[in-house]
Curated annotation (Swiss-Prot):
Top-rank taxon, per record: Archaea
Main location: membrane
Role description: Peptidase that processes the N-terminus of prepilins.
Name of the featured protein: Prepilin peptidase EppA
EC number(s) recorded for this UniProt protein: 3.4.-.-
Any one GO MF annotation of this record: aspartic-type endopeptidase activity
Organism: Methanothermobacter thermautotrophicus (strain ATCC 29096 / DSM 1053 / JCM 10044 / NBRC 100330 / Delta H) (Methanobacterium thermoautotrophicum)
Transmembrane segments: 1-21, 29-49, 58-78, 80-100, 104-124, 126-146, 166-186, 187-207, 231-251, 358-378
Topology with respect to the bilayer: Multi-pass membrane protein
Length: 385
């Protein structure tokens, strides 16, 4: 009975902490240390008490190991500018409270037992679910910013809808490639899904690169044949592909150029404040200062194009980083000095800190009630393929 109370109390505190952290992150842009540090201590205390009551020291040992491990992982991601410090400490707090999957709910749906558990520790399930929950939250958040303060980005966002003809042509080309793939694989002594997918991709690329008139004739002939063989499947397939292509293009727009513009502001050095996050790191090479936000893939492309591999290993000496912790007062003074000396322009791209705590809260709820979303997706893929 007491063990159940400890488990219920741990879940309640974790949910309450994540809820308050979400409110604070949205309202003030921070997750306060006065929340996370006491919760970490309380989690270790509760699991220590549980270990004593069950006469199993490994409960506390695993709790300490998982808590330290999640903090170390979070610290690495913080150094990589993926997470803010408050996010790291909130994940650590949840881990100290819930190092193992709580057995609060248990039900079955369509022959599957829920919540679905994974072979790895429960805190990793919370992290994975939080990351997956971030995508819909990011879409809603960015769209809200566009609608309220960046209306000029709406035209760019709606561009895929205006290109509905291009999307329809691509849907017809893919349908033609799928039809040809089925015809070809019927003559093969074996059926391999990966081979079929590769063949669909290659045929789509080949047909897309044909001259317009030849492409129109080939696609028309194949589509007519496909309609003759299975009218309903062909029509529904084309419509689903068309809608899917449009939705993917909308999401791609929202997550690339639109997000970059919506979640960044341009400011002068006198407008900079402590805690603001630069969009890119400031580097120095010799007497030259420059901002560089290129990814590793971008640098690989540049190296392949120019033959200069030095950019892969050395971009210069970091002067002011784009860490998620934000600018410090001394870094602002460094930027002010460089501007006054004419070394850099008085123009800085500042990232709006997107609150991650709500995604952590949603990820925790999903983990408790539904289970590991990654495992569910893997099972769905096994069923489909």
């Amino acid at each position: 009975m007491i063990l159940m109370v400890i488990e219920l109390l741990s879940v309640f505190i974790a949910l309450l902490a994540c809820f308050y952290a979400s409110y604070s992150d949205i309202k003030r842009g921070i997750i306060p240390n006065r929340l996370t540090f006491p919760v970490i201590g309380l989690g270790l205390l509760l699991n220590g008490a549980r270990a004593l009551m069950e006469s199993d020291p490994w409960i506390f040992i695993y709790t300490a190991i998982f808590t330290a491990g999640i903090f170390a992982l979070g610290y690495i991601l913080w150094r990589m500018v993926a997470w803010a410090g408050g996010d790291v400490k909130l994940f650590t707090a949840v881990t100290s409270l819930l190092p193992f999957q709580p057995s609060l709910v248990s039900y079955s749906f369509l022959g599957t037992a829920f919540p679905v558990t994974a072979s790895y520790p429960f805190p990793l399930t919370v992290i994975i679910n939080s990351i997956l929950a971030l995508l819909p939250f990011l879409l809603v958040y960015v769209f809200f910013i566009i609608y309220t303060s960046r209306r000029h980005l709406m035209d760019e966002f709606m561009e895929p809808l205006r290109q509905y003809r291009t999307s329809m042509v691509l849907a017809l080309v893919i349908t033609s490639a799928v039809t040809l793939t089925f015809l070809i694989t019927d003559f093969l002594p074996f059926q391999i899904i990966v081979l079929s997918l590769i063949l669909v991709y290659l045929l789509t690329m080949v047909i897309s690169r044909l001259p317009p008139r030849i492409k129109a004739v080939i696609v028309s002939v194949i589509i007519v044949y496909s309609l003759y063989k299975n009218f309903e499947l062909t029509v529904s397939g084309v419509v689903i592909l068309w809608v899917s292509i449009t939705v993917i293009q909308l999401i791609r727009k929202l997550l690339t150029s639109i997000t970059r513009e919506a979640l960044q502001d341009t400011m002068g050095v006198d407008e900079l404040k402590e805690g603001m996050i630069l969009a890119s790191t400031l580097y120095r090479k010799g007497d030259e200062y420059y901002f560089d936000d290129s990814s590793l893939l971008d640098r690989f492309r540049t190296a392949a194009r120019t033959g200069d591999v030095s950019a892969l290993t050395y971009r210069g000496e970091p002067v002011v980083s784009a860490m998620a912790a934000g600018l410090r007062e001394e870094e602002i003074e460094t930027l002010r000095d460089l501007v006054s000396r004419g070394k850099i322009k008085d123009e800085f791209r500042i990232r709006r800190g997107m609150p991650f705590a709500p995604a952590i809260f949603i990820g925790l709820l999903v983990s408790l009630l539904i289970g590991d979303l990654a495992m569910i997706l893997f099972r769905l893929f096994d069923i489909i393929f």
